[in-house]
Design a protein with these regions (language model features):
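Amphipathic, non-transmembrane alpha-helical scaffold segments
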Residues: 15, 19, 66, 70, ...
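C-terminal peripheral helix-coil segments that are non-catalytic and often amphipathic
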Residues: 1-6, 104, 138-150, 169, ...
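Helix-turn-helix
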Residues: 21, 25, 29-64, 68
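Hydrophobic alpha-helical connector segments
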Residues: 79-108, 159-166, 188
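Amphipathic alpha-helical packing segments from all-alpha helical-bundle domains
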Residues: 75-79, 123-150, 160-164
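Amphipathic alpha-helical segments used for helix-helix packing
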Residues: 104-125
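Conserved hydrophobic residue
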Residues: 153-154
Length: 200
């Protein structure tokens, strides 16, 4: 029987809540004015917390909290993707749900640019980097494997390699839509055509 994780203490819960509030304040600044507007002073002002509190949770200051905000966006993307997968009726709709989650995020002013363009440049590695892509590869791989087992996707398809290529294309979709939200319909249609080639 697996061991249950110990229940967090009140102090630990408060610490997590404070950290979450700081990250959300950072994301709100990005939503309003873009990543370049994020500073320790503004985060402290927006969150109503002292600079010392911010540094207690993020000793590296702005860089650390920007990484945490980027990681949080990646987690939100995965959550939205999984919700779309659960609501989809077949494998093609499931793959499209992955694309739609990315397009929805990318189309948000400032936030989409932060996740797809500015963030990766600011965060070459470390916390949050690649989390959304890794989860998307896993999700698409599972979708393809199930579709292959049902005879709906061509046998012999390398699910992992195909998932990796599809996620790579979605990164390009995210960059394009973040730069021009008007590109979303054409990008979505192109992804649908790309996935259609996988049918058995």
């Amino acid at each position: 029987m697996p061991q249950q994780s110990p229940t967090p203490t009140l102090r630990e819960r408060r610490k997590l809540a404070t950290r979450a509030d700081l990250v959300e304040s950072t994301l709100q600044i990005v939503r309003e004015d873009g990543a370049e507007a994020v500073s320790v002073e503004r985060i402290a002002r927006e969150s109503g917390m002292a600079r010392a509190t911010l540094y207690a949770h993020f000793p590296d200051g702005r860089d650390a909290i920007v990484r945490a905000a980027y990681a949080e966006l990646g987690e939100q993307l995965v959550t939205n993707t999984e919700a779309g997968i659960d609501a989809a009726k077949d494998w093609r709709a499931q793959l499209l749900a992955v694309a739609d989650a990315m397009i929805e995020l990318a189309a948000q002013p400032h936030l989409g640019y932060f996740y797809n363009v500015a963030g990766p440049a600011l965060i070459p590695d470390g916390e949050g980097r690649g989390g959304g892509s890794g989860a998307s590869i896993r999700i698409i791989t599972e979708v393809l494997q199930e579709a292959m087992a049902a005879g709906q996707v061509a046998s012999g398809t390398d699910a992992v390699a195909t998932a990796t290529l599809l996620v790579g294309s979605l990164r390009s979709v995210g960059i394009a839509v973040a730069s021009d939200a008007g590109a979303a319909p054409a990008m979505r249609a192109a992804f649908v055509r790309l996935c259609a080639g996988l049918r058995s």
